Amino acid sequence: AWRRNDTGIAAGNAGMVIRPEQPTVADMFRECGYTTGAIGKWHLGLSDRTGGQDWNGFITPGPSDIGFDYSYIMAATGDRVPCVWVENQRIVNLDPNDPIEVSYEKPFPGEPLGKDHPELLTKLKPSPNHGHDMAIVNGISRIGYMKGGKQALWEDENIADSITCKAVRFIENHKDEPFFLYVGTNDAHVPRWPHPRFVGKSGMGPRGDALLQFDWTVGE
């Protein structure tokens, strides 16, 4: 949204907002000999067009095409499908016998939706004013529709741990050489479902607990 005037809030299957021919800070660092990485919330799109992703193969163009040597990212945000990690442009833990399908136009037959099945929402209730009443993943309804990829789905309470672990490992692996690392946390972004060790600890509700979790990530 910040990079091009014709881009609003990107769907989870949007094409990449920053085109490969556009120079980036990551490109500049890489050209100067830095090892570059992008970890966490992405929401800049993947592939060359909306709906053009091969979710079950190598997704391109992607972070490697705009300057990043390594990437471990969400396709978009925590509240949009697909709810999976994408490492170096391939979905992590994907079972080829359970391929992923994604749509932002219509639901998949037989897949329950938050607006129709509130009894399946074991964590957060649907928020139809913002579109959070579609596909159900990890007991939370999302924006958009998806099916398959059950083995690859993230657990919201572990998102911060996943991002932090990957970021710390990247830093440790490259501490003796120049590196540039972009880390995008998802803590304050909906659905805000922090790890149990932070729940109720801030005294300021779920958002406060999520910010406490963010503080932990920065500290690590």
Regions found by a protein language model. Name each.
Residues 1-220:
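Formylglycine-dependent sulfatase
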